[in-house]
């Protein structure tokens, strides 16, 4: 058994310049917890594999392709491979989301 204390994981350097902590990384999948401060957002980007998001705290705005929705705690959002997407925190609260990429990407994310 492996137990991960997310608060002790290092913040990964990403082009989004946000708090992103890798919590799971195998040949089959990778998972990252992203924390967005109030009014913070990810840059629109394309991921080479399918992604699903599970909202851990508060409410955020997700954009996938031409769709936009407000999503709150305990909601899961599917995002197909190669479709532009991003998260936006328009609130005054800290937003936290679990990002799971399956299968584990072999090429990088592309910013738009």
Question: How would you describe each model-predicted region?
Answer:
Residues 42-44, 62-63, 79, 85-91:
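Short beta-strand His + acidic residue motifs that chelate non-heme Fe in jelly-roll/DSBH
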Residues 30, 59-61, 68, 84, ...:
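Structural motif
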Residues 81-106:
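Ligand-binding loop in jelly-roll beta-barrel domains
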Residues 35-37, 47-62:
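Short, conserved beta-strand element in jelly-roll/cupin
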Residues 33, 43, 52, 67-69:
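Short, surface-exposed secondary-structure edge patches
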